[in-house]
Structure formats: C-alpha cells, structure tokens
Amino acid sequence: MNKIVRKVCLNPTVTLMEVEAPFVAKKAEPGQFIILRVDENGERIPLTIADYDREKGTITIIFQIVGGSTIQLNYLEEGDYIHDFVGPLGVPTHTEGLKKVAVVGGGVGCAIAYPIAKKLHELGCEVHSIIGFRNKDLVI
C-alpha cells in the first residue's frame, strides 16, 4: 500500500497526486509508467510517471477523470492509500547525447513531456517545449 502525500486538482477533469513509493522513485526514469489498483478489486490502471523525487521517495502521477477507475482514484485524498503501485515499467526515453530538442505534449499527455524536458535540461540540452490544449479550461 502506498500513501498519497499530495493531491492537487489541476482543472475540473485532471488531478495530480504525489504518492510515497520509494522503491519506484529510486529507479524511475523519464518515459516510464506505473500500474496501480485503487483497491483489491479494482482494475489495473497504467499511468505515466509525471515526476519523481528520489530524496523524498515519491512519484507524481497526473490523470484525467474519464471512467470508473479514475473516478474511484479521484475520491482518494491526502493520507489515503493506493492498494497496488507497481513500477517503474517500460523503456525510458533516450536522453543521452542530444544537444537541441523540441518536446511536444498535448492535454494530459503533457504529463510525460515534463520529466523528459527536465532530464534533457539537466543534461545540458537546449530544450524547446510545445504544448497544446483543446481550450483554456483544460490547461494543466
């Protein structure tokens, strides 16, 4: 079980959660994801790792409330626990040796753009970001 340490409503349909997951945070890299289950009977939900903090041992996820499982996840508050939180999964995005990059994201897909842009910047790469949303109410 993993504790929710921060919850922020980014807009009426998108939520950010920071979750205690030290083993996941220790190994997380940009471009990877986690799979969670809200409770023992819940379905498995794959979500992008939007950020990670190795020192605090936390993983940040951003999700759009679109169906039963994300509605159930959104009911949880700071201090509540997520039943299963597995990761990091997937192949990290290649970031080594690049000099100038445009990182593009749209809507909730901007969640994956941030850790990639952050890592590239840390490596000394010139990073330009292009983000888009359907309308001003959906900006995260």
Residue ranges and their predicted role:
Residues 68-140:
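FNR/FR-type flavoprotein reductase catalytic core
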Residues 1-78:
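Ferredoxin-reductase
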